[in-house]
Amino acid sequence: MTYFVVFLGLCFVLGGLAVASNPSPYYGVVGLVLASVAGCGWLLSLGVSFVSLVLFMVYLGGMLVVFVYSVSLAADPFPEAWGDWGVVGYGMSFIVVLVVGVVVGGFVEGWDFGVVTVDSAGVFFARLDFSGVAMFYSCGVGMFLVAGWGLLLTLFVVLELVRGLSRGAIRAV
């Protein structure tokens, strides 16, 4: 299990690297999906299943809309590739900053790493993410409706902006 968690952490860092050094919006989507899957899998391995599922739906539902919008506005006929020197330079600088942060953080913290799960207080302790689900659905109904309406409005605004002067996604029947 430890190797799997380390693998998920490595995938999360590589996904962040792919988002930070993307040469074009086409490749940013790949890095975002990799980072969100790895991060939510990491949370799932720590025992926070509901929060992991909600974050996964928010990342892939909300952020992919932003990337689709940016891809439609910045559609290059010849986009840069991963192997260009500028992209490799950004990637190497990201890795250098990451290694320096790990080394400095390790010296400051004394290399005291540990994993604490949500239900580490015992058998009779209520899990925090399950007790939060009831509050989320009982007190948050109005916020769900407002957020859903806002997302629907955002979708129509993005579709209207993308279509430009041509007859695009929203047409009068």
Swiss-Prot record:
Ranges annotated as spanning the membrane: 1-21, 27-47, 48-68, 87-107, 113-133, 139-159
Gene3D superfamilies associated with the record: NADH-ubiquinone/plastoquinone oxidoreductase chain 6, subunit NuoJ (1.20.120.1200)
Record-linked Pfam families: Oxidored_q3 (PF00499)
Family indicated by similarity: Belongs to the complex I subunit 6 family.
Bilayer topology term: Multi-pass membrane protein
Species this protein is from: Cepphus grylle (Black guillemot)
Enzyme class at the top of the EC tree: translocase
Record gene name: MT-ND6
Catalytic activity, EC: 7.1.1.2
GO cellular-component term (any): mitochondrial membrane
Cited function: Core subunit of the mitochondrial membrane respiratory chain NADH dehydrogenase (Complex I) that is believed to belong to the minimal assembly required for catalysis. Complex I functions in the transfer of electrons from NADH to the respiratory chain. The immediate electron acceptor for the enzyme is believed to be ubiquinone.
The name this protein goes by in its record: NADH-ubiquinone oxidoreductase chain 6
Presence of keyword Mitochondrion: yes
InterPro entries the UniProt entry points to: ComplexI_Subunit6, NADH_UbQ/plastoQ_OxRdtase_su6, Nuo/plastoQ_OxRdtase_6_NuoJ
Catalytic reactions of this protein: a ubiquinone + NADH + 5 H(+)(in) = a ubiquinol + NAD(+) + 4 H(+)(out)
Keywords tagged on the record: Electron transport, Membrane, Mitochondrion, NAD, Respiratory chain, Translocase, Transmembrane, Transmembrane helix, Transport, Ubiquinone
Source species taxonomy: Eukaryota, Metazoa, Chordata, Craniata, Vertebrata
GO molecular-function terms, A-Z: NADH dehydrogenase (ubiquinone) activity
Top-rank taxon, per record: Eukaryota
Cell location: Mitochondrion membrane
The keyword Cell inner membrane appears for this protein: no
